[in-house]
């Protein structure tokens, strides 16, 4: 395990006279560096540019070697702004890839792509570091057993269950509850699985990253008093960063997650927001390196880059990394090469609906649009599969009848259809759930609902046993027993009002 020379002073000083080069050309975030004959750095080696700019300010820029050009020159991509760099500046080859701190010291902290803390909470223990470029686990290390990753969120566990060690695409516009759902998943994995989470903010708005951090502190996901008790490590490479940083920040987050999986043998949740920005940054870097663009102007190495990231996200015999990736779809075109390449790797999709959010049904997960490869009778069992299919059929029938209801009203429906609508409305409300992390906003305590409880609840609604209960009794409750208790309270309240 190497100490990271880019983040620890002694590491650089020992290498200073080892392999120095000189900056020969600087074009935006791309540097060409000349080295002495026979001393060329390897691809992916970290280079450090140290010196003073034209106004005497200290400059410290880390780059990553991307191409060997010949004539003892390499082309490298900078991980931070190249303002103030000049030709002739000394560039030191660290002799190793970028390495970042890993382990318990990362929890509750915010890092940049280099693994440097950016939250003004002091230095991080860098005794244990991992290089960000690592090979995917070998076949013999993989855990091929198909198992459900229980989240405690009814709509997810029943209709679009997550695979342990799988990859899930999270689709949703602004303001439909993506962040709250992410925070609830982080909270639930810590409580139910004893696991931790790593959040990789890739090329998104700095304001959103800051809001997420503040909300995590407010909801207790990050414990300010005792950082070691926090449940998440944050790695940010936001929109204002150079493309090199945005391209590599996903790997930094993944490396931190791999440590928890391989060394601590934990179940880890890895969030990537947004996977499209990873592809976009790769496209920018590819153009800067002079590669011929491929379809729609994307990099020719699109599938390779995506595969090198996604193949490291998997279950091994030690633990698992389950990844939830927000997917931006440019111009809502699902055939665009970026989302199309992402879909090839996904095991499940969770689609958030603005219509449900407008009705106040949270989490606003669309039960008909969300899918999962795990929803098969041989994996989840006949009972689960049958219940999920009947819930979907009832919801679909209600959706088909909505136009008729809007024009003619409920009275014009057949008795059977009226019963279907009543049950579908109960199902829709029962798919909502109070979240632990939303307690501070809603005032109602959060609920973790086990899969068996979830299936039992929906079976009771579908069988007609609860047809006599008012539909508002099913809104924002945990299991079905809470719904029946709420119905009794509503009866008592209405009797008192009379």
Curated annotation (Swiss-Prot):
Catalytic activity: ATP + H2O + 4 H(+)(in) = ADP + phosphate + 5 H(+)(out)
Gene3D superfamilies given in the database record: 2.40.10.170, Bovine Mitochondrial F1-atpase, Atp Synthase Beta Chain, Chain D, domain 3, P-loop containing nucleotide triphosphate hydrolases
Coiled-coil region list: none
Alphabetized HAMAP family for the sequence: ATP_synth_beta_bact
Subunit composition and interactions: F-type ATPases have 2 components, CF(1) - the catalytic core - and CF(0) - the membrane proton channel. CF(1) has five subunits: alpha(3), beta(3), gamma(1), delta(1), epsilon(1). CF(0) has four main subunits: a(1), b(1), b'(1) and c(9-12).
Matching PANTHER family: ATP SYNTHASE, ATP SYNTHASE SUBUNIT BETA, MITOCHONDRIAL
InterPro entries named in the record: AAA+_ATPase, ATP-synt_VA_C, ATP_synth_F1_bsu, ATPase_a/bsu_AS, ATPase_alpha/beta_chains, ATPase_F1/V1/A1_a/bsu_N, ATPase_F1/V1/A1_a/bsu_N_sf, ATPase_F1/V1/A1_a/bsu_nucl-bd
Record-level GO cellular component terms: chloroplast thylakoid membrane; mitochondrion; proton-transporting ATP synthase complex
Membrane topology: Peripheral membrane protein
Name of the protein described by the UniProt record: ATP synthase subunit beta, chloroplastic
SUPFAM superfamilies: C-terminal domain of alpha and beta subunits of F1 ATP synthase (SSF47917), N-terminal domain of alpha and beta subunits of F1 ATP synthase (SSF50615), P-loop containing nucleoside triphosphate hydrolases (SSF52540)
CDD domains documented for this protein: ATP-synt_F1_beta_C, ATP-synt_F1_beta_N, F1-ATPase_beta_CD
Biological role: Produces ATP from ADP in the presence of a proton gradient across the membrane. The catalytic sites are hosted primarily by the beta subunits.
Compartment annotation: Plastid, Chloroplast thylakoid membrane
Binding site for ATP: 172-179
GO biological process: proton motive force-driven mitochondrial ATP synthesis
PROSITE patterns documented for this protein: ATPASE_ALPHA_BETA
Keywords: ATP synthesis, ATP-binding, CF(1), Chloroplast, Hydrogen ion transport, Ion transport, Membrane, Nucleotide-binding, Plastid, Thylakoid, Translocase, Transport
Family to which the UniProt record says this protein belongs: Belongs to the ATPase alpha/beta chains family.
EC number: 7.1.2.2
């Amino acid at each position: 395990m190497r100490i990271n020379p880019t983040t620890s002073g002694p590491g650089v000083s020992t290498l200073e006279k080892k392999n120095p080069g000189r900056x020969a050309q600087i074009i935006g975030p791309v540097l060409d560096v000349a080295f002495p004959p026979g001393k060329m750095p390897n691809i992916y080696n970290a280079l450090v540019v140290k010196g003073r700019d034209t106004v005497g300010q200290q400059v410290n820029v880390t780059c990553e070697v991307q191409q060997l050009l010949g004539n003892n020159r390499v082309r490298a991509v900078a991980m931070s702004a190249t303002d103030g760099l000049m030709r002739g500046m000394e560039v030191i080859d660290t002799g190793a890839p970028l390495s970042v701190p890993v382990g318990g010291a990362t929890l509750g902290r915010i890092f940049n792509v280099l693994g440097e803390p950016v939250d003004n909470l002091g230095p991080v223990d860098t005794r244990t570091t991992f290089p960000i470029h690592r090979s995917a686990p070998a076949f013999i290390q993989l855990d091929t057993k198909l198992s459900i990753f229980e989240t405690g969120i009814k709509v997810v566990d029943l209709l679009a269950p997550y695979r342990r060690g799988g990859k899930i695409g999270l689709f949703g516009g602004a303001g439909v509850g993506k962040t709250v759902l992410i925070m609830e998943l982080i909270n639930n994995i810590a409580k139910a699985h004893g696991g931790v989470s790593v959040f990789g903010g890739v090329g998104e708005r700095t304001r959103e990253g800051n809001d997420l951090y503040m909300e995590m502190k407010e909801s207790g996901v990050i414990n300010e008093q005792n950082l070691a008790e926090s449940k998440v490590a944050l790695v940010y490479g936001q929109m204002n960063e150079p493309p090199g940083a945005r391209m590599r920040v996903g790997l930094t987050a993944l490396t931190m997650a791999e440590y928890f999986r391989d060394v601590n043998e934990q179940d880890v949740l890895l969030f990537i927001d947004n996977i499209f920005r990873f592809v976009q940054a790769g496209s920018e870097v590819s153009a800067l390196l002079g590669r011929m663009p491929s379809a729609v102007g994307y990099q020719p190495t699109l599938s390779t880059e995506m595969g090198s990231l996604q193949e490291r996200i998997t279950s091994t015999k030690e633990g698992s990394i389950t990844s939830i990736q927000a997917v931006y779809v440019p111009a809502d075109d699902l055939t665009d090469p970026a989302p199309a390449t992402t879909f090839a790797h996904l095991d499940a999709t969770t689609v958030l609906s603005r219509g449900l959010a407008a009705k106040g049904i949270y989490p606003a997960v669309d039960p008909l649009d969300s899918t999962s490869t795990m929803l098969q009778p041989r994996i989840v069992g006949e009972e689960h599969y049958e219940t999920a299919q009947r819930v979907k059929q009832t919801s679909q029938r209600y959706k088909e009848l909505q136009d008729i209801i809007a024009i003619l009203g409920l009275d014009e429906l057949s008795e059977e259809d009226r019963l279907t609508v009543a049950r579908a409305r109960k199902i829709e409300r029962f798919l909502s759930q109070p979240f632990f992390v939303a307690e501070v906003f809603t005032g109602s305590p959060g609920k973790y609902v086990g899969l068996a409880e979830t299936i039992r609840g929906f079976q009771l609604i579908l069988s007609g046993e609860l047809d006599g209960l008012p539909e508002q009794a099913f809104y924002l409750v945990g299991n079905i027993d809470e719904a029946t208790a709420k119905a009794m309270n509503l009866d008592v309240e209405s009797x008192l009002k009379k």
